[in-house]
A protein has these predicted regions:
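Rossmann-like dinucleotide/flavin-binding elements
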Residues: 1-16, 164-173
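Glycine-rich active-site loop/strand segments that organize a redox cofactor
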Residues: 21-73
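Short glycine-/acidic-enriched loop or helix-start segments at secondary-structure transitions
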Residues: 4, 27, 97, 143-145
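Conserved beta-strand segments of alpha/beta enzyme cores
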Residues: 14, 85-87, 160
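Feature captures the FAD/FMN-dependent oxidoreductase FAD-binding
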Residues: 58-141
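Glycine-rich dinucleotide-binding loop and its adjacent helix/turn
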Residues: 67, 136-173
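Glycine-rich, phosphate-binding/catalytic loops in enzymes
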Residues: 11, 32-35, 148-154
């Protein structure tokens, strides 16, 4: 989402990034202890680097960062460079076409999008948009353990004993 925003800014197009978390890349922070399998050169977008250059940012050296390093050295500075275009605590709860529903479908593709937003501690609001990029990822909606994308037998009943997260086994002593 942040990199897409940098590309749109280069094209002088209006952009809003809606981040459900209270910080940049909040989902990545939850697995910040995990080392990525991509080198820095594959993780830094060219348009984002150009936007960051104006802030005095320097690209990280080559290597394989952890999620926390990716945030600290790149994603957080990029979010800062985007400024108030990034709205934190703004969970998207729906995207629809203006004036269209399951019964009224004619001309659907010609209508702007309506983005339904639920802010942390506030009242829901809506934004009109010509285009929407969903960069939310799958962190909050992990795949179930069963076949065919469905929960395994007994998975729902055992939900309070299951975790789909990446454990952190580092010694913190």
């Amino acid at each position: 989402g942040l990199a897409a925003a940098a590309h749109l800014i280069e094209r002088r197009m209006p952009v809003v990034v809606l981040e459900a978390g209270d910080t940049p890349a909040a989902a990545v922070a939850e697995w910040g202890h995990v080392r990525l399998f991509s080198d820095w050169s594959e993780l830094v977008d060219a348009a984002s680097a150009r936007l960051l250059d104006a802030t005095g940012w320097t690209p990280p050296p080559s290597g394989y960062p952890t999620g926390a390093q990716w945030i600290g050295r790149y994603l957080a500075p990029l979010a800062d460079a985007l400024g108030d275009r990034v709205r934190y605590g703004a969970r998207v709860v729906g995207v629809s076409r203006s004036g269209r529903d399951r019964l009224v479908d004619a001309g659907r593709g010609d209508q702007p999008f309506t983005v339904h937003v639920r802010p942390t501690g506030g009242d829901d609001y809506r934004l009109a948009a010509r285009a929407v990029i969903d960069a939310s990822g799958t962190w909050e909606t992990p795949n179930p353990a069963g076949a065919d994308g469905l929960p395994a037998l007994g998975e729902r009943a055992a939900a309070d004993r299951l975790s789909y997260r990446i454990p952190d086994f580092r010694d913190r002593s």
